[in-house]
Each structure stands twice: as structure tokens, then as C-alpha cells.
């Protein structure tokens, strides 16, 4: 029994302190990476080829954290998708870099997450990873995110946050991670935390950011400004205004 317990914890031994803060009973929710052998590639309309994932399955997820208070305002359900090619030094969740890690993200899982949001004390959904904005993960997420937004429209009290290692400019038309579904995803988001984690800029005092280069973008305000000024989202960025009480938190 002790050996099995240690094996269950082994993936977390490679994570930072943030990952180790998860309750130990969740260690079993991580599944070892599986090979891509035998999986056929998918091609997007713009010609971009994704790694071999079966046609009926676009994405795996590494973990779901219910009642999460670390990844966005309030109490949230957080979905950690699998797959990231960025490889940031000292990433808090490097076990989710492998696209084959975890379990299939299917309709049953979607329904369970949406059901978890249907409580007055839950403030919304957070999507992180891994990298949600990897092209194949965008394809696996877009319909789900639109389902959540339809169930809980803007102003309903349920917000959708997304953490990405991309900067917003990379998600604009012509950017490295812009696909035919990117605009649909961005249209559903209330908050986008953008930018790669940079160890040299690490700052423990930041709320919902790991390093000072990252931004918490208020997407509703950004969309409104972009429309008002007739410019691209990346040229109309409005940063999230946190409660002033947190500005006094220093080390």
C-alpha cells in the first residue's frame, strides 16, 4: 500500500510547490502519458497539422480541480488541459506538457464541469494547462467554452478565465496560435491571463500571475474599447482592476 501511495505521488514530485498544494487525494487523478502511436493527424482549415489525435478525440485533460481558489477570482472549477510545447523553465505543471497525459475530454466530462458551476457559491470556470491555446486544444475546447457561455452569459455572475503562455498578439490573425476557432474562444472569455512564465521575473506577491511580464486582461473592457476605437484587441488591452486591498500585499 505504501509503495502504491508513493507511485501515485511520483508525478507531483516533478512539480513546483504550487502543484504540491493540491490535496493528496487528487494524486490519483493524474494518469501516466500514453503514446501517440497509431493516432492519425488532424489538419485544420488553414493547413496546420496537429499531432496524432484520433478524429473523435481532440484533447486530453490532466486534472479538474473543483472548489479552486488559486486560479481566478472567488471559488471556481478549474480545467487543466494536457499538452504544451512552450516548456517554460520551472513551470508549475510540467506533468501536463504531454498531449497524451491524463484522460479523454469527452461529453461526459463537459457535462460534469458545467453541472459543477450550477451553485451560487461557484464564481466560474478557469481553463489552464498545459496550454489551452495550442491549436489542437483550441479545437477541443471551443464548443465546450461556448456551451458554458450559453449556459452562463456575461453578467450572470459566472466568469470564464483562461491562462495562456501566449501573449494576446500571438492569438490575433497572423499570430502563431491563431486558428479558425481562436476568435470564438476569445469572444467567450471574461479574463485572459497571458504571457509565458519567466523565472527571472518571478514575483510571489502577484495575484493570479507567476511573473511580472504576464498580464490579467479584462476581455470585456478590451472588446468594448476595440469596438469603440476600431482597432484590434491587442491594441485595446484593458488590464483587470483588482480589489485595491490586494495592492498592500508585499513580501
Q: Predicted regions span which residues?
A:
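Structural recognition of alpha->loop->beta junctions
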Residues: 175-201
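Basic polycationic patches enriched in arginine
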Residues: 14, 18, 31-34, 39-42
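Extreme N-terminal basic, low-complexity initiation segments
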Residues: 1-13
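Conserved Radical SAM active-site core
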Residues: 57-61, 75, 90-176, 180
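N-terminal [4Fe-4S]-dependent radical SAM core
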Residues: 49-80, 89, 93-100, 228-230, ...
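P-loop/Walker A phosphate-binding loop and immediately adjacent motor/lid segment at beta-alpha junctions
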Residues: 146-149, 202-250
Amino acid at each position: 500500500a505504501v509503495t502504491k501511495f508513493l507511485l501515485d505521488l511520483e508525478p507531483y514530485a516533478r512539480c513546483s510547490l504550487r502543484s504540491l498544494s493540491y490535496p493528496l487525494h487528487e494524486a490519483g487523478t493524474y494518469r501516466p502519458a500514453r503514446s501517440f502511436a497509431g493516432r492519425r493527424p488532424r489538419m485544420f482549415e488553414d493547413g496546420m497539422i496537429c499531432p496524432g489525435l484520433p478524429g473523435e478525440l481532440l484533447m486530453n485533460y490532466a486534472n479538474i480541480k473543483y472548489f479552486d481558489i488559486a486560479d481566478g477570482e472567488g471559488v471556481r472549477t478549474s480545467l487543466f488541459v494536457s499538452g504544451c510545447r512552450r516548456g517554460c523553465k520551472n513551470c508549475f505543471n510540467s506533468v501536463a506538457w504531454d498531449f497524451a497525459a491524463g484522460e479523454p475530454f469527452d461529453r461526459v466530462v463537459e457535462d460534469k464541469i458545467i453541472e459543477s458551476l450550477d451553485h451560487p457559491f461557484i464564481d466560474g470556470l478557469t481553463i489552464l494547462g498545459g496550454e489551452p491555446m495550442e491549436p489542437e486544444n483550441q479545437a477541443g475546447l471551443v464548443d465546450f467554452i461556448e456551451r458554458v457561455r450559453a449556459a452562463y452569459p456575461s453578467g450572470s455572475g459566472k466568469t470564464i478565465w483562461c491562462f495562456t503562455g501566449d501573449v494576446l498578439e500571438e492569438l490575433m490573425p497572423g499570430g502563431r496560435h491563431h486558428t479558425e476557432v481562436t476568435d470564438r474562444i476569445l469572444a467567450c472569455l471574461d479574463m485572459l491571463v497571458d504571457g509565458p512564465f519567466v523565472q527571472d521575473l518571478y514575483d510571489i506577491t502577484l495575484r493570479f500571475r507567476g511573473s511580472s511580464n504576464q498580464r490579467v486582461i479584462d476581455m470585456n473592457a478590451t472588446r468594448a474599447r476595440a469596438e469603440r476605437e476600431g482597432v484590434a484587441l491587442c491594441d485595446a488591452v484593458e488590464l483587470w482592476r483588482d480589489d485595491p486591498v490586494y495592492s498592500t500585499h508585499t513580501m
